[in-house]
C-alpha cells in the first residue's frame, strides 16, 4: 500500500511522517487489499487535525480526527479508519446479490 502524507499550514518533520507510516501500516496489515491511502495533517487555531482518505471495495472511506497533540490525532485517525473499514467490510459482505 502506498501512503501519501501531506501537510497543510505545517512543516512535516520526519517524526510525523514516521508516526503516520507506523500507525497506518497496522491498518494495511488488517486490510491488504488497500492500494493507496492519503493522509493530510493540518494545523488550525489551537487544534491539530488529521484527514485520511482511501478507496475500499469501490467506496470512498474518509475519517477525521483532531486533538491538541498531533501524535494523538494521528493515532485516533488510524483507529477510526480501522473501525470504518471493518464496518464497510461487514456491510459489503452482508448484502445479498
Predicted features and spans:
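N-terminal, polar/charged subdomain of small-to-medium soluble alpha/beta proteins
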Residues: 1-97
Amino acid at each position: 500500500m502506498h501512503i501519501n502524507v501531506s501537510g497543510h499550514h505545517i512543516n512535516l518533520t520526519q517524526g510525523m511522517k514516521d508516526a503516520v507510516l507506523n500507525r497506518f501500516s497496522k491498518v494495511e496489515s488488517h486490510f491488504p487489499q488497500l492500494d493507496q491511502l492519503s493522509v493530510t495533517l493540518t494545523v488550525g487555531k489551537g487544534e491539530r487535525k488529521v484527514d485520511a482518505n482511501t478507496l475500499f471495495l469501490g467506496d470512498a472511506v474518509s475519517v477525521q480526527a483532531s486533538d491538541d497533540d498531533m501524535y494523538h490525532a494521528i493515532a485516533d485517525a488510524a483507529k477510526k479508519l480501522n473501525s470504518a473499514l471493518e464496518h464497510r467490510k461487514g456491510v459489503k459482505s452482508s448484502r445479498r446479490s
